[in-house]
Structures are given as structure tokens and as C-alpha cells.
Amino acid sequence: MLHTTPSGLLIIDKPQGVTSFDAVAAVRGALHIKKVGHAGTLDPMATGTLVIAFGHATRLLNAIVAHDKTYEATIRLGLRTTTDDAEGEVLVDGEARSRWQTLSAQLTEGGQSGEPTALPTASWQDLLTRTIATNFTGDIEQVPNTFSAIKINGQRAYDLAREGKDVELKPRPVTISEFTVLDIRSGFVAGEQAAEPLREDANTGAIPALDVDVRISCSSGTYIRALARDLGKELGVGGYLTRLRRTRVGRFALPDDASGLIAPEAMLDTRTHTVTAHTDQKTFTNREGQTVTRNKCVLDTPEGLAGDERRNWLLDHALTMEQAARGAMPALDITPEEASELRFGRRIERTISEPTAAIVPQTHDVAAIIERANAHQAKPVTVFPLA
């Protein structure tokens, strides 16, 4: 059956174990639309807000990518990994162990060097609060992770790192508007697997560690793995990320977002427009004739829906083009006559200071993205066809 191509946004709650591209592929297949993209990659181990645009709304993605974001994460202190997260190999650092014992003696009564000690969480709370406030809030310089998608002379940093090559990334400015410690758990790990849970007993060879739950609101381009790495480095004990959940991208937030950074009048109805998903497996034969099994992203829709019914259910849960544009950038209500002028590439007599969505409110028509031409006029930089 032929369909008119719709445009809008889906807020996907990405599950763990799949890539952001897997989620895009799931939306593309369910909606039968080729033009689909996302506003900011989430690593496979991460969950949460993935803003996926389809149709003409993909032209809003550049604006959405630049929005600030909120994450909830768990940082493990006491060890390091090769990738600064739970996907890498554990690195047991003798200097870090020694530093842990020094902190143990400072923060506990009778802490003895040479013995694995789980520090009281109350003592850690004060130390972490002071360290974060001094070093990891406001405008800071951050060196991205070696295992990142940043390109160096045309090659991804993670590809170079996997090949064993030296990767040098320059620090870049980022802004941390919130870095709150939510909970602290003290315990021990064997140090063999990065994702192993903390345990209370200290067996022979056990390594003391601390899991710190945090909420971080930050500018676009901030690496939470790098914050975990740098917090551990600042304390001298090592650190890496074991859990990451993105709860907000600009005004697009999951129902469980607790940042409080979206003004009530600016809130979108995310409960209606969030689609959860889960990880499943698919098996296929590759070009070499090998049988391959890998994870895939499956969108959660009511049981029994398929084909057009499933497609329509997802479209009903999507943000419309107008809602998407108003959420992506400042919006300006215009007249139908002004919309026509913009579609012909002409300027309109409006004063604006930043890229703005020009919308005819009566018909919900998103005509264009406009920018300042001069003190009294605005000009179109992106024009959308009349729906």
C-alpha cells in the first residue's frame, strides 16, 4: 500500500545492548520510511533518550544535537578499565591501591595500610562533593575518551585504539551545570570483570571499590565516561563508568527525568510520546556464508499489532512536525502570507536574533527555519514543503 511520507519525532527509550543505529533501523522498518536519523549517539551499554526524526523532521536534528543533556550514571571508583567503562578490560593500578589505603587511613579511624578497606559512604560523600565542586562543575576542559568516535586524520579514535596505536585527543571546552551524587555503595570486587557487582565480603585478593550514582547535566559533546575517568584520576584511585542512562536531550525528556531543568510551560508530553524498546537477537548468513547472531532493537507496541496498524500506532505516539520544531528551537508564529514568501526564498519583516522555526499556528504549518538577515528582517535557511 502507498503511504504519504509523514514527518515527526519519536522519543525512544533505548535498551542496553544495541546501537543507536539499531534503533534507527527499527523505526525505519516499522514506519516504512527511508529518511530516518537520530540526535546524538548512545553507546550500546547506555540506555535512555534517543530522539529519532523521520521525514522532513530530520532537518531539525542539527539543532537538537546541540542541546544540553542530562544523564544518570554509576561511577565505580577504585579501578580503571581500558575503555573507561564496563566494556573494557580491568586495569589494576598499584599506585591507585596505595592511594586507596591512604584515603582509608584519612577517612576512617584506624585505617591500616595493606588491608582492603571499604570506606564509610558518609566520609566519601563529603570528599566527593568537594572534589566535584572544585574540579567538575561549570566550564571545564575535557579530554575525550580514547575509545570514542572522534576522527583523527580520517580515522575513528576507537579504531586506532583497537589497533594498538597511540591516540592523542586535544582537550575541548564543556559545561557541567549539574553533577549531583545521588547514592554511594561500598564493597569489594575481584577485579576480573569490569561489570561484576559489588559484594560485601572481602575475600583473599579482594579489591575495595565504591559505586557512586550520579546525575549530570551538561553541554553537548560532554563524555560521561571521561568524567568518570577524570574523577577517579583526581582522587588518585581510578574510576570508570558501569551504568549510563540519558534522561533528557533539551526539552525532549523521558518520564523519569529528575533534572528539573525544563520549565513547566516548556514541557512536552513525554509520557504520550515515549516509545520503549527491548533487545532481541537475529541470526543471518553473511556474505562469507557464515551464520552470525547479533542483537537487534525491537520497538514495544501493543501485542497483535502488525503492518499498517503498528505503523499507525507509532505515528500516533510521535511528536508532530510542529511539536518537533517548537521543541528543537525558538519558534515564531507567522501568517500564511509570510509562509508563502519564505517558501519563495524571500525575506520577511521580522526581528530575530537566532535560528528560529517559522510556524503558521492556525494550520500547524512549519514553513521554514529562519535566521537574522538584518536588524529588521529574517531570511529562510531551510524551507519545508507545505504538508
UniProtKB/Swiss-Prot annotation:
EC top class, as a word: isomerase
EC assignment: 5.4.99.25
GO MF term set: RNA binding; tRNA pseudouridine(55) synthase activity
Keyword terms of this UniProt record: Isomerase, tRNA processing
Lineage: Bacteria, Bacillati, Actinomycetota, Actinomycetes, Bifidobacteriales
Function: Responsible for synthesis of pseudouridine from uracil-55 in the psi GC loop of transfer RNAs.
Positions of the catalytic residues: 43 (nucleophile)
Coiled coil: none
Catalytic activity: uridine(55) in tRNA = pseudouridine(55) in tRNA
Family: Belongs to the pseudouridine synthase TruB family. Type 1 subfamily.
InterPro entries for this protein: PsdUridine_synth_cat_dom_sf (IPR020103), PsdUridine_synth_N (IPR002501), PUA_sf (IPR036974), tRNA_psdUridine_synth_fam2_C (IPR015225), tRNA_psdUridine_synth_TruB (IPR014780), TruB_C (IPR032819)
Source organism, top-level taxon: Bacteria
Alphabetical GO biological process terms: mRNA pseudouridine synthesis; tRNA pseudouridine synthesis
Gene3D superfamilies per UniProt: Pseudouridine synthase, PUA domain
Protein species of origin: Bifidobacterium longum (strain NCC 2705)
The keyword Isomerase is assigned to this record: yes
Protein's UniProt name: tRNA pseudouridine synthase B
